[in-house]
Amino acid sequence: MVGFFIGNGGFGGKGVGSATLTEDQLDSTVASYSYNGKKSDITAREAIESQYSLDTVKDSDGNYTAPSADVILSYVRNQILLDAAEDEGITVSSKEMKQYAEDSIGTSDYKTMATQYGVSKDQAKQIVRQSATLQKLYKKKVGDSSASMPTAPTEPADGNEETASKDYADYIINLAGDEWDSSKGTWKDADSTYAKAFADDAFTADSATYKQAMTAYYTAYQQYSSQASSASSKWTEYANGLYAKANISIYGLFA
């Protein structure tokens, strides 16, 4: 990351210089960053609560584990992305947060999340809000890919991969989508992905083997993997471009 460097230690304005913090040191500055002409300071409390509850890092003496450089960097990068989302005019509604939570976490109950992940209810809500915001930024910059990981076909009860059924044929045709011509019972284009995969292994709409279904599965998975990799690379390039514009200072951490 351009502009990144580790600063000197010390408390107060200079930040944290020990592995543990007392209660009154939680609001000490542990890092600062400049992005788009704006300078922001980060306190130990903010860095810790970006991933944990204070109680989680509190020891038996009433002190708190100082946030690591990795935790702080993660927090700063997240803030830069959120700043970018704000610049793009991206916001999320309560309904969108609820949908995101249910899709990604399995529940939209913030109390349940708090208990499950060891954070406060307010933290859980904030994490969902930020994550949903970044998801919208991702879709805006990368695109909302329709690619989804395929589900493997059900193995035959007898373990014979040559076992044939209409279910396996339906499975293949469903994965192939528009590449299959249902009116003619064959491939629309001999040069299409699935047509090539089955060039020497024909099947009908009424019957296909488990082995053939697995061929379709591997084909679908390769397509999914390729699209996912492309999207990941595009997002990484975008995010790194933002990070390169930031100057980040971390002050004397030893956690």
Where are these regions (language model features)?
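Solvent-exposed aromatic/hydrophobic patches embedded in short alpha-helical segments
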Residues: P67-A85, G89, E96, A101-D109, ...
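Short, low-structural-confidence N-terminal segments
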Residues: M1-P67, D178-A255
